[in-house]
Amino acid sequence: MMAVDKHFSELRQGDIIFLDFNPTKGDEQKGYRPCIVLTKPLRYLNYMFGVAPITTKAKQFPLHVSLTPEMHVQGEVLLEQHRMLDLETRSFKFVERAPIDLVTECTIKLKLMY
């Protein structure tokens, strides 16, 4: 798995990136970890991105989405932990792009929360 630098303006919905989630509180996912970009680029807030962390500790939960076996990053997307982050001020590394089916499943489940 080769992580590469990208400018935040190059990120797209479905990109898998590594970034530092700190600072966090309570049971929020902490530290440097993979996540999926959930939002499409916003013209008026192009530095703010909705992301959800990915964990390797799989648990059966309705808001978790398993990554596909052919992906470099393995685990489950934790949609209940999604949040907006300013990626202009946080360093991150691009790893890969998720298949469209996985992105669609994430966005459908995310919409169920609102």
Predicted ranges, named:
Residues M1-R33, V37-Y114:
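Conserved functional hotspots at enzyme active or ligand-binding sites that engage polyanionic ligands
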